[in-house]
């Protein structure tokens, strides 16, 4: 619900004018405040997990209640063509943190694995990547991350924490080093490598049946087999079972953990109190750093399955458990925004809200939909080309600096947040690497009418599925699809029966010639254009093709973080509270803020 406190507060005129003066200084680069922390805006970045762009009232949903996010949009700038750089958690967040496509850091699929699978894998965001947190830290900011990380933990030994948030510019971390999955809820079916797990269990049963058959045959005298051979085969079967069950049999204990900085504080985590713990930590962080400046990246666990929702919100929405979780997320965000206002920081805080990618259409429990709604846009999570997989909310808020109620339809990217916040604090983006994002400051303020992106490239794993051309002279936004997933069943708009749609192989269609859409006239990508229906068809295909060729010249080989050797669970890398393998601990209290 909207807070009366948020509606009724008004800061003194002198304080209200301060952000405006700072903004003009940063924009025009005519002054550089060196010492006064008050001249640097606090940065609050809020990212939902798996939220569909059609799930919010401010984006057209009139059946889910999201008053706090809607108010943020009313008081700020709302982007309607805001795009994730990847359609899955790990690569999208890597791109967000670094302002670079995830494949540039090796943080995207080179095989069947498209996201990190274990806390105890050795893959993760490389140490030589620069996050916006590191740059802000160098400019005197306190930098905190609360919530989901999913960018890896260790490289070579338990505790080296080479991929840990504290090794990437954050000086405080509280949350999940991994991500929520169904495995975190004992009452849900398995999710992490569920198909492989079922296959390994089948092999184990086959081996056990063979060993029992040999033992029975030898005992009954049906055939002659030495006891040593039977014992040896039984040993092999046991070793095989232990080799996979030691990881897959304890997914909840290995992956579903909470950490504070370098220490595991809860293993496995108690889902029912997690939301309260995250809220308590966020409010506490704001209060501790209210004299600023601070960066707080609030990386929400909502609204990823298993949709852990407190009793206060269960059964309250019109859309089942998913809707309940969305409305709880909005309430939690409202509490955080209240903390900003209660500490007198509303007019000195740059706030941003988004989702890491589109809603998860395939997330179902029988006939119940457990994933988000992507509005008019085709596709969803896991689909790198279709709009539903990559179009996300984008809301920016800074009273007195950004115009209230402004709506921008220009193509923008999650990768743009990196150079945007770096510019706001007076920093510079790295000059020794490709940065794919562009600062949104001129666009948000109204100094520029057009996005700096002429072309945007949309990947599924390391496969280029589509490209977007924002034609400057006409204003048209053309979208070329080179590869699309094959929906199952045909025409369903998703790949039901599997976790997400594939990026390559037999489950995709390669289009020769490519599909072409004009998003400015057909944002739902319902009517592909042809040479007969669009006179510019061949010219557009050729121009986008040339841009793709130029883009590919910027690519260079890097170590693959999702390689099989990096993805595998390694017991010596497992974060552990206590003595491995007897890892167990719980936080005191219920997390009530």
Swiss-Prot record:
Binding locations of substrate: 148, 304, 381
First and last residue of the signal peptide: 1-33
Residues that hold Ca(2+) according to the record: 49-50, 89, 356-357
Superkingdom assignment: Eukaryota
Annotated localization: Lysosome
Top EC class for this record: hydrolase
Free-text remark on how the cofactor is bound: Binds 1 Ca(2+) ion per subunit.
Residues listed as glycosylation sites in the UniProt record: 61, 128, 347
Catalytic machinery residues: 89 (nucleophile), 150
Xref: Gene3D superfamilies: 3.30.1120.10, Alkaline Phosphatase, subunit A (3.40.720.10), Helix hairpin bin (1.10.287.550)
Alphabetized InterPro entries for the sequence: Alkaline_phosphatase_core_sf, Sulfatase, Sulfatase_CS, Sulfatase_N
Recorded GO CC terms: endoplasmic reticulum lumen; lysosome
Modification note: The conversion to 3-oxoalanine (also known as C-formylglycine, FGly), of a serine or cysteine residue in prokaryotes and of a cysteine residue in eukaryotes, is critical for catalytic activity.
Keyword tags: Calcium, Glycoprotein, Hydrolase, Lysosome, Metal-binding, Signal
Cofactor: Ca(2+)
EC number: 3.1.6.-
Molecular-function GO terms, alphabetical: arylsulfatase activity; metal ion binding
Keyword Signal attributed: yes
Residues bearing PTM 3-oxoalanine (Cys): 89
Pfam family of the protein (one): Sulfatase
Tissue and organ expression note: Expressed in the pancreas, kidney, liver, lung, placenta, brain and heart.
Entries under PANTHER family matching the protein: ARYLSULFATASE D (PTHR42693:SF5), ARYLSULFATASE FAMILY MEMBER (PTHR42693)
Protein family membership: Belongs to the sulfatase family.
Protein name in UniProt: Arylsulfatase D
Organism this protein belongs to: Homo sapiens
Taxonomic placement: Eukaryota, Metazoa, Chordata, Craniata, Vertebrata
């Amino acid at each position: 619900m909207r807070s009366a406190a948020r509606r009724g507060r008004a800061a003194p005129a002198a304080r209200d004018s301060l952000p405006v003066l700072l903004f003009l200084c940063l924009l025009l680069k005519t002054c550089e405040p060196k010492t006064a922390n008050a001249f640097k805006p606090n940065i609050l970045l809020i990212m939902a997990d798996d939220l569909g762009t059609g799930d919010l009232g401010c984006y057209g949903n009139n059946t889910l209640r999201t008053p706090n996010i809607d108010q943020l949009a009313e008081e700020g700038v709302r982007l309607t063509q805001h795009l994730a750089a990847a359609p899955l958690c790990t690569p999208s967040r890597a791109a967000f943190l670094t302002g670079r496509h995830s494949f540039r850091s090796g943080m995207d699929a080179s095989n069947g694995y498209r996201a990190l699978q274990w806390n105890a894998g050795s893959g993760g965001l490389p140490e030589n990547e620069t996050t916006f947190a590191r740059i802000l830290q160098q400019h005197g900011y306190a930098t905190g991350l609360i919530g989901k990380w999913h960018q890896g933990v260790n490289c070579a030994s338990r505790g080296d924490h080479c991929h840990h948030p504290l090794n990437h510019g954050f000086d405080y971390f509280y949350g999940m080093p991994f991500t929520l999955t169904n495995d975190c809820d004992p009452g849900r079916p398995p999710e992490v490598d569920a198909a492989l797990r079922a296959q390994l269990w089948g092999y184990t049963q086959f081996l056990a049946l063979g060993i029992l058959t040999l033992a029975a045959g030898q005992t009954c005298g049906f055939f002659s087999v030495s006891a040593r051979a039977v014992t040896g085969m039984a040993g092999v079967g046991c070793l095989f079972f232990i080799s996979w069950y030691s990881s897959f049999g304890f997914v909840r204990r290995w992956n579903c953990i909470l950490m504070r900085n370098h220490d595991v504080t809860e293993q496995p985590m108690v889902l029912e109190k997690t939301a309260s713990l995250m809220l308590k930590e966020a409010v506490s962080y704001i209060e501790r750093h209210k004299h600023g400046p601070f960066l707080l990246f609030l990386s929400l666990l909502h609204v990823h399955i298993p949709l852990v929702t407190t009793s206060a919100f269960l059964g309250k929405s019109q859309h089942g458990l998913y809707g309940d979780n969305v409305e709880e997320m909005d309430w939690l965000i409202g509490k955080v925004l209240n903390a900003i206002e209660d500490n007198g920081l509303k007019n000195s805080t740059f706030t941003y809200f988004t989702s890491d990618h589109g809603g998860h259409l395939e997330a179902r429990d029988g006939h119940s939909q457990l994933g988000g709604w992507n509005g008019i846009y085709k596709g969803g999570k896991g689909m790198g080309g279709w709009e539903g997989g990559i179009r996300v909310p984008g809301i920016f808020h800074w009273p007195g600096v950004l115009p209230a109620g402004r709506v921008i339809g220009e193509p923008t990217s999650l990768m743009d947040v990196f150079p945007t916040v770096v510019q706001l604090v007076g920093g510079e983006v790295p000059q020794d690497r490709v940065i794919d994002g562009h600062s949104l400051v001129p666009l948000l303020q109204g100094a520029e009418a057009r996005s700096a992106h002429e072309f945007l490239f949309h990947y599924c794993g390391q496969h280029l599925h589509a490209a977007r051309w924002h034609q400057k002279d006409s204003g048209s936004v053309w979208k070329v699809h080179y590869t699309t997933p094959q929906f199952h069943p045909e025409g369903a708009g998703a790949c039901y029966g599997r976790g997400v749609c594939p990026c390559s192989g037999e489950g995709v269609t390669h289009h020769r010639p490519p599909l072409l859409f004009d998003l400015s006239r057909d944002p739902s990508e319902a009517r592909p254009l042809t040479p007969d229906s669009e006179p510019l068809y061949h010219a557009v295909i050729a121009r986008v093709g040339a841009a793709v060729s130029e883009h590919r010249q910027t690519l260079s080989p890097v170590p693959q973080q999702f390689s099989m050797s990096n993805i595998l669970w390694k017991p010596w890398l497992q974060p552990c509270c206590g003595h491995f393998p007897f890892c167990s601990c719980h936080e005191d209290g219920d997390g009530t803020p």
